[in-house]
Amino acid sequence: MEDIQQNNSMVEIRELNTDDYEELSLFNAQFPGDKRTKEDWLNRFQHWWDNNPAFDDKWIRGFLLIADGKIVGWVGSFPTWFKAGENIVKAFNGTSWRVLEPFRKYSIDLWTKNREISKHFISFNTTPTEDVIKMITRLGYVKYPWGGNRESYYLLKPYKYIQEILPQTWHRLLPLMGTFIILYQKAKIRLVKSNLTLKLLDINADEINELWNRNKNRIEFTNVRDSLAIQWYAENKLLLSVFLGEKLTAIAILDLRKNLKYDSFELTFVDCWVDYEISIMSVLSAIVRFCIKYAKENDVSRLRFPHFSPEYSNTLKKIGLLTKKYDHPGYIRIPDYLKKSFTNESSYFTLLQGDYGV
């Protein structure tokens, strides 16, 4: 515990523990600009720590900034299992560095506490502000490999999205333009046919483990995707299985959530793990086809497919989806003892990194 004097208030930094969940969830829900409820935050804490297969009692959840007995700031982290070469290690995923305005001068003191822990781990920061980016890049963080600065998408209800970029005087043309976009997408898209079948069902743990073990040695640096990890990542998301006959050949995680800006639901492609024997074109075509059908049946306005790698980028472009700019702010810091074996070509990152898709 570290005590600091501010005027007549005693400010301290201490470790976060389970007894703090209630007060911290309320602090987060009431923090300026936050859109989650107290219950949402309690569920996040349980997911990050209590239900996390990589978490144990040795892991420090984070640190609180306390003034006169009340939480005025905090910073957190949670672990995930990560494959680094031949080793399975814990990765450090930083989250939620936030401090109330009157106490901002202690922000660096608070962040430094987390930094002291994270320097021994592979460490991710996936939701940094511009100021945070300037700071973490000085500490050795770099953008992790990605498939360029575009993402593919498919609009099922284009009207709200068009409305945002058109002047008011053009809004009478929205129905016509929306119809044109829908027809244009249908004419442009090229989905290859295959014998793959897709299911939104619970998958047998042994099948997931077999898929992971068959393919894990193709990539040096990536998230562990055994059954425990996948089921944790997929909590409150859609877990999609891809079969060729009776054999599980791919799994994908999809995230359905409301986009408050457009007041519409969107389905985002969060992760995909594919058997090396199956073409990525066949798998992505099947997934896109499934997502379009699912969206029509569940009032989803837009499908989003981030480009996890150059291979995903090239394949999604060949499929013919529309694309737009997507500057994914994912940063990683590799400890010195692992740097020699880390290359862009040997790595595979998705939206499972940090707290972005978790």
Name these PLM-found stretches.
Residues M1-D19, M177-N204:
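Conserved N-terminal entry element of GNAT/NAT acetyltransferase domains
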Residues E2-Q5, F121-K186, I253-M281, S285-V358:
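Active-site/acyl-donor-binding loops of N-acyltransferases
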Residues I13-F92, S96-W97, K199-V274:
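A conserved beta-strand-loop-helix scaffold within acyl/acetyltransferase catalytic domains
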Residues I88-F92, I108-N114:
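"Short basic amphipathic alpha-helical interaction patches in structured regions
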Residues R98-D109, D275-S285:
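Conserved glycine-rich acetyl-CoA-binding loop
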Residues L110-K113, A229, I287-F290:
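Short, hydrophobic/aromatic alpha-helical segments in well-folded domains
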Residues W111-R115, F121-F124:
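A generic, well-ordered mixed alpha/beta core segment in the N-terminal half of proteins
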